[in-house]
Amino acid sequence: QSRSSAASDVYKRQILILRTEEMFTYIDSLEDLEFLNQELNQKPFVAVDTEFRRTTKDNMRLALLQINDLEEIYLIDTVLIDNPENKCDFLFSDSVTKIFHSCKEDIEAVYSWTGEVMVNLFDTQLAEAFLDGHYSIGYQGLVKEKLGITVDKGETRSNWIRRPLTDSQLNYAASDVEFLIELFLDQKKALIESNKLKWHDEELKFLSSRIYSPNIQIDETCKGLTKAEEKNL
């Protein structure tokens, strides 16, 4: 068994443990966020998702930031912590891969909260486009197709700004990052084997440049798959 395959098996055992315990920690203070940031800066990768409210076409307010580091799921209350004060720089670290699904709006939401540009991203929707030609598959659909697991969609249109959040909202938010790492491990291996990982990385840099450039109008219909489509995958 190769070293990379053995490492993947270790991570997947951790996934099974996390899934069995079904736990999450709620972070609602700068002190807790600072401690968590120190922990997450030591991780090779974390799964990330956001809940937000769009206030206008080009503006949004981040309401919740969900993180899975394989040991635990963290729900960071960005309404109560409205100014992170550089306490979440793991999001901007080159050494920590941030795993998203359909990351365009997540990138915008994090930027609206921090004013900083995330780096070293992986997008499971984009990876699926390069691997199987599925250009806009949703998170629930991908989890069902690849893992045979049904993910709850009941709180998709909830009011994420109102506090306190309900137990149903919290459980839904946690489930949005529960399976991302498992998808990432399989997809990254497949992208490397098919020599497509560079395409994925280049596409994400292209997408980020569109979002953060002040001279480019953000197209709300953009899925971040322009180059993938050009390659006719």
Regions found by a protein language model. Give the residues of each.
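Short, well-ordered alpha-helix to beta-strand connector turns
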Residues: 7, 43, 94-95
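Mixed-charge, glycine-rich, non-catalytic linkers/tails in nucleic-acid processing enzymes
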Residues: 170-233
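Single conserved hydrophobic/aromatic residue that forms the stacking wall/gate
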Residues: 1-14
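N-terminal accessory regions of nucleic-acid-interacting proteins
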Residues: 17-46, 50
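Small/polar loops that bind or transfer phosphate-bearing groups
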Residues: 2, 28, 101-102
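An N-terminal structural lobe/cap that precedes and organizes the functional/catalytic core
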Residues: 51-68
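A common structural microfeature
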Residues: 43-45, 61-64, 73
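Active-site-proximal helix-loop-helix substrate-binding element of RNase H-like nuclease domains
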Residues: 66, 71-86, 90-181, 187-188, ...
